[in-house]
Amino acid sequence: MAEPVDYKAPPYERTALRISTMVITCHWGTPIHLDVLFDQLPPIMIPMWYPDIGILKFEHKNKVLGSSHKDIFTNRKITPKSFFNQSTLVIRRMIHEGTDRAGWKEVNVKLFANGGIQMTGVTSEEFAYQSLEWVLQTIQTLPVSPFEGKASLERFSVQLINTDYALNQFINQDALHKLLVNEYNLSSTLEKTIYQGVNTKFYYNTFHSGNGICQCENFCKG
């Protein structure tokens, strides 16, 4: 009878930590009439194939102008849930310009009727701010201003930063989840449906040891 083989996993190599995406909020400093903006955008929008920066898509209520890279691969045109006080603008910008990493980047910009702005798909504050400056300058060239008053970029703020790194090895998610819960007593859930992965909450508090466990007496949001 053959003796059992003592399997040892190969060593992993962790890549450098990188910022994958950020969520930015800002404000025009004045309300904006989204219907007026929708009516004036068609002449200045660019098609998907056009190799330059520009506005690719504008989604307002149940209407849509243009298309984005994501639409082509998902066969989606209009968001299932449409809100009448907001619109979605998809712009194409050059990222890492002047370097060997230069390329096109599509950015989603949500515009709210009260003047609020939410931007996703950006990787740096500088790129986000420059993109919003470009959007403002572009809107200001329209024959009729959709803004109620003088617009500017106000309350620019980073709301969320997503980072990631790779181990370049297969991860046994079931075993990892059990290890985090049973061995380290961390808050963890194992997702096996649409967005597969191990969702772990590591609570950080400067007043307690870095074991990742919430020290609050009552349930909190971390």
Question: Residue spans of the language-model regions?
Answer:
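Intrinsically disordered, low-complexity polar/charged tails and linkers
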Residues: M1-G222
